[in-house]
């Protein structure tokens, strides 16, 4: 029990550290340098429109390359619908869906608790998958992909998106934002690719620590359950 408690404490500390760093390692609105910066980097960051550093993806799943219907989960990112909901929500025919490939991004415009402006996630878990055409897909071009993935985990993009999002029909819970407006949103990025990479790597290492602790906690809880069952047989 002590071991389990210590892993849970460490996990909470790492999660808290990540939340703090996501708020402080990207500049606040109207600023061009972050509150906390990695050693060895200086100078102001630059403002870019998303369309200048990315390319929209609109390829359809015409040849049924994939039948893995994905959904965006706040905790797990882009994940197989069957794995997440324990059932398939998408229609039987997914040929009209977008085909997303590993490393590409998707913006889910539906808002939920803690995600007032929807969520933007990168596909990391599978080689490909399909998404409803309600999603906006893109890939990083003139920016480090790991940097961008973690920038969109912060709330720094919310202000820009909220300025061009008119709420659509409430019953769908979807934000009414046109792709052209979405790609015109501005973000501040380090001028040097090296700094972008360093930030991306910092957060990847932190994610790995969090994931390994979550796995260890899960293993210990399973073991504890088994030991308790054995005791009462």
Name what the model sees in each region.
Residues 95-159, 166, 170-171, 178:
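A short beta-sheet element
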Residues 37-61:
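Non-catalytic DNA-recognition/assembly elements of restriction-modification systems
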Residues 5, 88-94, 171, 193, ...:
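Short, solvent-exposed loop/turn positions at domain surfaces
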Residues 1-46, 192-233:
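Amphipathic alpha-helical segments with low aromatic content
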Residues 34-37, 133-136, 181-185, 206:
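Short amphipathic alpha-helical segments
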Residues 28-31, 128-130, 177-180, 200:
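Short, flexible turn/loop "capping" segments at secondary-structure junctions
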């Amino acid at each position: 029990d002590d071991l389990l408690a210590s892993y849970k404490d460490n996990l909470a500390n790492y999660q808290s550290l990540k939340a703090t760093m996501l708020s402080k390692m990207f500049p606040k609105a109207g600023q061009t340098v972050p509150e906390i910066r990695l050693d060895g980097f200086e100078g102001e960051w630059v403002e870019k429109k998303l369309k200048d550093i990315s390319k929209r993806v609109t390829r359809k799943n015409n040849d049924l390359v994939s039948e893995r219907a994905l959904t965006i989960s706040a905790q797990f990112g882009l994940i197989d619908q069957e794995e997440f909901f324990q059932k398939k929500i998408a229609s039987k025919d997914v040929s009209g869906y977008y085909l997303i490939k590993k490393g590409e991004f998707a913006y889910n415009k539906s808002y939920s608790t803690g995600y007032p402006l929807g969520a933007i996630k990168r596909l990391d878990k599978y080689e490909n998958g399909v998404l409803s055409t309600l999603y906006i897909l893109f890939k990083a071009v003139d920016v480090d992909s790991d940097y961008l993935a973690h920038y969109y985990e912060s709330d720094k993009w919310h202000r820009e998106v909220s300025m061009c999002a008119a709420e659509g029909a409430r019953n769908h819970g979807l934000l009414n934002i046109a792709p052209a407006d979405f790609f015109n949103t501005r973000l501040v990025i380090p001028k040097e690719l090296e700094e972008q990479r360093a930030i991306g790597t910092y957060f990847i290492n932190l994610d790995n620590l969090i994931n390994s602790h979550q796995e260890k906690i899960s293993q210990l809880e399973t073991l504890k359950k088994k030991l308790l069952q054995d005791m009462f047989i």
